[in-house]
Amino acid sequence: MKTKLILLYGGKSAEHEVSLQTAFSVINALDLEKFEAAPIYITNEGEWIQGPLLSGKLDFVEQLRFSATDTIKLATTESEKSEGEAISPAVLEADGQETVVFPLLHGPNGEDGTVQGLFEVLNIPYVGNGVLASSAAMDKIVMKKIFADAGIPQVPAVAVRLIDWKNYQAEMVAEMEEVLTYPVFVKPANLGSSVGISKATNKKELADAMTEAFLYDRRVVVEQGVVAREIEMGVLGNDTPVCSVPGEILPEGAVATFYDYKAKYQDNNTALIIPTEVDPEILEQMKEYAVQAFLGLDASGLVRADFFLTEDNQLFLNEVNTMPGFTPYSMYPLLWQETGLPYGALIERLVDLAKERHAAKNALKYKLED
């Protein structure tokens, strides 16, 4: 019997369009001889809409943007159900068929542990990281604390709350300028794909960048800018993760002063070098830090570790991404392709890891013996 693979994408997130691109790519790579593919589109308004079972490849991303008029509206994230009515969408029920959910969601309400919690409550296997790893890695402030506890080197940074910025802006700027030197990068704590991130080279730009970042989150992290190579590495597995070859991001002709949202997803001017050349000793250190980060987060399935490597060979772990993009030009699947694991095989491996993790969880004891 085929495995029913529920493909969940879209979502109430600034990264809604990225999620659609990821879903389009994954769906077209599925082996429909092995999987029964059931797409569910989450609209910008939070509605869950079930599309038809897929019988072939898609031609356009827009084919995934279902509407309630021509498909089945399953549920909504807003409170519209009457008291006592079941809240789990019927499509998530296995009905005796082996079922796995593949959440192709990015950003808040997607890779931050919230939707993962739903699958945990429903006891359905799902691809990728659990609640803890997803939420911790999504929050740049919490993530940095975990890395620091593991002894992983990071660039200097300062965390700022919106309430403190409103009440003590001058003092906060003074603290930042004491710890950091320009340029700095200002980032919302809970967002990915460089959304809301700005580079600041002076006090005026810093204030503008803080205003921009606080549009997306009430907590912001300000990081020291460094002149460095941007090198990424894929991590794959559960309890015994393995690393891919390293890849490097090279924006052509100074397309962007940093690898921003537009460069990542909206143009083809970003060059990826896979594998990239790294000193063997540094490469081993990179693998060690990537695995330490994976295990420190209690990650599962997949993680992409993003590093900075300076000219004098200082290595910093910038961040990890627990749901890296799967677009045709995304780094994570390309890293594994060059390591020897093709795209379709990578997807199947992730599904197998989801089943493995779910089985291990269900083997645990959840009640005391009489």
From Swiss-Prot:
Catalytic activity: 2 D-alanine + ATP = D-alanyl-D-alanine + ADP + phosphate + H(+)
Gene3D superfamilies, per the entry: 3.40.50.20, ATP-grasp fold, A domain, ATP-grasp fold, B domain
Cofactor requirement: Mg(2+); Mn(2+)
Domain ATP-grasp: 144-352
Alphabetized UniProt keyword annotations: ATP-binding, Cell shape, Cell wall biogenesis/degradation, Cytoplasm, Ligase, Magnesium, Manganese, Metal-binding, Nucleotide-binding, Peptidoglycan synthesis
InterPro entries membership: ATP-grasp (IPR011761), ATP_grasp_subdomain_1 (IPR013815), D-Ala_lig_Van_CS (IPR000291), D_ala_D_ala (IPR005905), Dala_Dala_lig_C (IPR011095), Dala_Dala_lig_N (IPR011127), PreATP-grasp_dom_sf (IPR016185)
Origin superkingdom: Bacteria
GO MF term list: ATP binding; D-alanine-D-alanine ligase activity; metal ion binding
Gene Ontology annotations for the cellular component aspect, listed alphabetically: cytosol
EC number: 6.3.2.4
Pathway annotation from the record: Cell wall biogenesis; peptidoglycan biosynthesis
Class in the EC hierarchy, top level: ligase
Annotated residues for binding of Mg(2+) 2: 319, 321
Binding annotation for ATP: 177-232
Stated family: Belongs to the D-alanine--D-alanine ligase family.
Function: Cell wall formation.
Protein known as: D-alanine--D-alanine ligase
